[in-house]
């Protein structure tokens, strides 16, 4: 897996003899590769979101023998996971009928959710779209872009929906929301300021520190959103990010895969360390670029002695485009 916390849980728990013994004693354990079986992943991710209000990977689901979920979560540290295994085993032994009843109810709710809007047909009324957009705009973070709080995932589908709403209604609020979020992500640490392409999500509300894995589907969807924004408005940042994201997809995920295929993701970890290929210190910049250029780059990209990530390292950000002409005149 590309996900950092998937690596952590695999090492802490699944490779641990004590945890393995507890799992094998009380459960039939199945590990699903979501890239090979996205259909299975989608079913249990819907259950995880429905039961917890959020989703993510690693995804941990406990099922009845017929495959119906009754308890779901994501990452658990070893001690908490051992406690959870014990509690689930005890509950299954002593209250099995209640668990099965709950799982039946959850399965019924998931089937209802999957059936779509009540009375829905091929046409969606404009009024329904307007109400949906109004609800989305109420949730936007007007200070940092995006919708809701941390962690923040790139809202590619919402950006595309807002652009389509703008095309239909010429709503300035919809376009402003796209510009606010598009700018914030493209200038933040979630976007690779050197190599192009977006990371999976931001752990904070200001798009500063990402979870560093890069996913094919995220970047394909964001390419579409930024290209749509650029085509409709001519915004130079949108044009630049769309071009860089396309180049990242072709060079990093396309050229290194078999013919006519793409690599599905880039790992968050390198040499066992999260994000090590994406973070910098002021000293590293001066070592690579020299004293003057290194200090200038640190200022441009927000690289400080204190750092924004771990151990005094900083994720590159680009709060404003550099004045290259003034730099050359020095």
Where do the PLM segments sit?
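Replace the tail clause
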Residues: 1-330
